[in-house]
Structure formats: C-alpha cells, structure tokens
Amino acid sequence: TGLVSALTLAGMAASIIGARLCLGNGRHRIISFVGMASVIVAAVSSLVLGAPVWIALGCLFIYNVCIMLDSGALTAGVVSVAGEGDRGALLAVHSMVGFAGGSLGAPAVGMMLDFGGGGDRLDAWSGALLIMGLGSALVALIQWRAWRRHGFAV
C-alpha cells in the first residue's frame, strides 16, 4: 500500500505541476511534449521489465508521472476555452471522452497480455506497455497538430 500511496501522491503532484507548466509555456506544446515523453518512457519501461526490480519500478514510477502530467493541463484547457454557461456541459463531454479512452485502453492492454502469453510473462507486459505508449502517442499527435494549427503560439 505504501508504493500505491506514493504513486498516487506523485501523480497528483504531477497533475498540478503539468497544469502550472502550461500556464506560461502553452498548453498544446506542453501536452505534446509530455505525450512524447510518455511514449519514450513507456518504451524504455517495456525494455527494462526484466532488469533489477528497482530499475523497473523506477521507470514505471516515471511513466506514472508522465501520464499524470497532462491530466490537469487538459482539464484546465477545457475550462479555459469554455464559455461561462457551457463549462458544465463541456466538462461532462471531456469526462466522457476520457472514460471512452480508458474503456478502449483496458481491452487493448488485455489483448496484448493475451497475445503475449498471459499476465505472468514479462514480454506480454512489454507489449502492454507499448500499447499504452501508443495511446500517449495519439494524444501527443493531436496536441502537436493543434499547436501547429495555432502557429506554435498556444
């Protein structure tokens, strides 16, 4: 439970830090960079699962932080572009899109675990981490396109 508590607290801090980073550096830019960092850390994590446990856990801890860095920034971005009377509806749609991503991600990870021979095999978990990284790559691409569309200024 101590490890899970540390992951949760680090994720909460990362979410706040990510939102703060976006204030002065551009939301799309930061989320795009964080998404690509998540892809890289997911790939590295998939390669070190067979390493000593402290190395694998360290990489997975960093991956957790990378994943959480953009959550506050995405929510703050939704609130900042919503009109006064539309915030509730826009946040509801934002939440639904997030849950839809989660509902697609879990079966994709499960499928990779099955294809890899089951949850007790490291190579199956490596594939699962790569699938999670693919989700981060998709978010990074969407944000990068938005950043380019806004002239690299947002």
Spans of features found by a protein language model:
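Loop-to-transmembrane helix entry
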Residues: 1-9
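Residue-level signature of mid-helix packing/kink "hotspots" within the transmembrane helices
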Residues: 8-16, 103
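Helix-to-loop junctions at the C-terminal end of transmembrane segments
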Residues: 14-27, 113-114
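C-terminal transmembrane helical hairpin of 12-TM major facilitator-type secondary transporters
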Residues: 26-74
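Multi-pass alpha-helical transporter architecture, strongest
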Residues: 47, 129-154
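Intracellular helix-loop hinge segments at the cytoplasmic ends of transmembrane helices
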Residues: 73-81
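A late C-terminal transmembrane helix in Major Facilitator Superfamily
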Residues: 81-117
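A membrane-interface helix-boundary motif in multi-pass transporters
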Residues: 111-134
